[in-house]
Amino acid sequence: MFVARSIAADHKDLIHDVSFDFHGRRMATCSSDQSVKVWDKSESGDWHCTASWKTHSGSVWRVTWAHPEFGQVLASCSFDRTAAVWEEIVGESNDKLRGQSHWVKRTTLVDSRTSVTDVKFAPKHMGLMLATCSADGIVRVYEAPDVMNLSQWSLQHEVSCKLCCSCISWNPSSSRAHPPMIAVGSDDSSPNSMAKVQIFEYNENTRKYAKAETLMTVTDPVHDIAFAPNLGRSFHILAVATKDVRIFTLKPLRKELTSSGGPTKFEIHIVAQFDNHNSQVWRVSWNITGTVLASSGDDGCVRLWKANYMDNWKCTGILKGNGSPVNGSSQLGNSNPSLSSNIPNLQNSLNGTSASRKHS
């Protein structure tokens, strides 16, 4: 049973992103009003805004939390072509904010010449690293060599994706069998049939990221992308938000089937595809065990998807924009989890509404 709580966010323009911290008791929001707000959950379950500040000189597209092992750290990215790292500190004894916490900017990352469309911290086992992607088609990976000094970040990698980038996701697996991996989505809407999702893998020999795979079946603009938490699986699960919701499995091929010294090759299958939103899908997000996927779309609803014991994915819940659930199995629909020879039949046209995006 879901309990919905409405929050008067007091942003003065569109809210583009909402991000929860590791424990789910803190929340950050960002908006076209150029600000970020931090919210804390009280013991009664109410959310209270505990900080609000102007972060950029343009619309703020994304905000994300670092793992709490590195402190209370946020990163944001903006249309102003920058990403920024923020840290919450407690006022010193000689500070007028003595004993009070407040957020300070630790660094501004200025390497992009175009809108920075997404920013994500790497899994904590990799240290304090973050990746950004930009409308110029470049993914950049930064590292803070000293976690006690967040003003120093070094640009470690620049990866060209050939298409404007809209979203990125780190593979969260900490297994030594899985090298660091980043999935990149593009919302390029030019009339071509180029694939919009690319997978890049870190190569220990060359110490560079190289393209491992391309999801050739995703040719529509991609708005969000998310690897599922791994929890010991030998394969990866990737969710893609485009004109519908798609879930892929990526199973690494045996080493003898891949080129020596080259990136891992994968056997890629689409295991679910849902057009229930009947509109553009803007966000996908996994629960902590990687067993439930939430998606939100222009229909104003959040839908929850879960696989059964046969690995067939079905819609298990729908929440309207006002937080009220949609009752009745007819509303849930048969979400077509079984995809095989009938995949082409699912490419039905969707009458989704267009929305202003980052490159306009």
Swiss-Prot record:
GO molecular function, one term: structural molecule activity
Its job: Component of the Nup107-160 subcomplex of the nuclear pore complex (NPC). The Nup107-160 subcomplex is required for the assembly of a functional NPC. The Nup107-160 subcomplex is also required for normal kinetochore microtubule attachment, mitotic progression and chromosome segregation. This subunit plays a role in recruitment of the Nup107-160 subcomplex to the kinetochore.
Activity regulation comment: The GATOR2 complex is negatively regulated by the upstream amino acid sensors CASTOR1 and SESN2, which sequester the GATOR2 complex in absence of amino acids. In the presence of abundant amino acids, GATOR2 is released from CASTOR1 and SESN2 and activated.
Pfam families according to UniProt: WD40
Protein's name in the database: Nucleoporin SEH1
Species for this entry: Mus musculus
Record PTM Phosphoserine, positions in chain: S190
Covalent link (Glycyl lysine isopeptide (Lys-Gly) (interchain with G-Cter in SUMO2)) residue numbers: K12
Record's subcellular location: Chromosome, Centromere, Kinetochore; Nucleus, Nuclear pore complex; Lysosome membrane
GO biological process terms, semicolon-separated: attachment of mitotic spindle microtubules to kinetochore; cell division; cellular response to amino acid starvation; cellular response to nutrient levels; defense response to Gram-positive bacterium; mitotic metaphase chromosome alignment; mRNA transport; nuclear pore organization
Compositionally skewed regions (Low complexity) per UniProt: 327-351
Encoding gene per record: Seh1l
Gene Ontology CC annotations of this record: GATOR2 complex; kinetochore; lysosomal membrane; nuclear envelope; nuclear pore; nuclear pore outer ring
